[in-house]
């Protein structure tokens, strides 16, 4: 059983019991979160439900387990033959959610 949810402009494939890193949102650790924008899902019996654009009545419930920052991404701009370069770094915030139930 799995579902494809939309959060923060991105799509994620989630399964029950799985921990997923999503875009940061302001909730404390241990708080419940619900996702109503389920784009597609498969039931335990193997039936696939495809939304147009979302599956009506479908819901994914999870619990926040961690708030943090990802590894640093380095951006390097290099100008050839000019002996010039520019280095920049970025660390994206994330919220880790453990999926507790999927209802389609």
Swiss-Prot record:
One of its GO terms (molecular function) is structural constituent of ribosome. The keyword Cell inner membrane does not apply. InterPro entries: bL21-like, bL21-like_sf, Ribosomal_bL21, Ribosomal_bL21_CS. Part of the 50S ribosomal subunit. Contacts protein L20. It comes from Francisella philomiragia subsp. philomiragia (strain ATCC 25017 / CCUG 19701 / FSC 153 / O#319-036). This protein binds to 23S rRNA in the presence of protein L20. One of its GO terms (biological process) is translation. This is Large ribosomal subunit protein bL21. Pfam families: Ribosomal_L21p (PF00829). Belongs to the bacterial ribosomal protein bL21 family. GO terms for cellular component: cytoplasm; ribonucleoprotein complex; ribosome. Keywords: Ribonucleoprotein, Ribosomal protein, RNA-binding, rRNA-binding. PANTHER family: 50S RIBOSOMAL PROTEIN L21 (PTHR21349), LARGE RIBOSOMAL SUBUNIT PROTEIN BL21M (PTHR21349:SF0).
């Amino acid at each position: 059983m799995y579902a494809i949810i939309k959060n923060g402009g991105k799509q994620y494939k989630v399964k029950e019991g799985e921990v997923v890193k999503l875009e940061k949102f302001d909730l404390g650790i241990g708080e419940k979160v619900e996702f109503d924008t389920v784009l597609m899902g498969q039931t335990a019996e193997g039936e696939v439900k495809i939304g147009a654009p979302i599956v009506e009545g479908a819901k994914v419930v999870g619990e926040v387990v961690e708030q943090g920052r990802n590894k640093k991404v380095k951006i390097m701009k290099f100008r050839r033959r000019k002996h010039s370069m520019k280095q920049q770094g970025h660390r994206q915030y994330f919220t880790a959610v453990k999926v507790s139930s999927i209802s389609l």
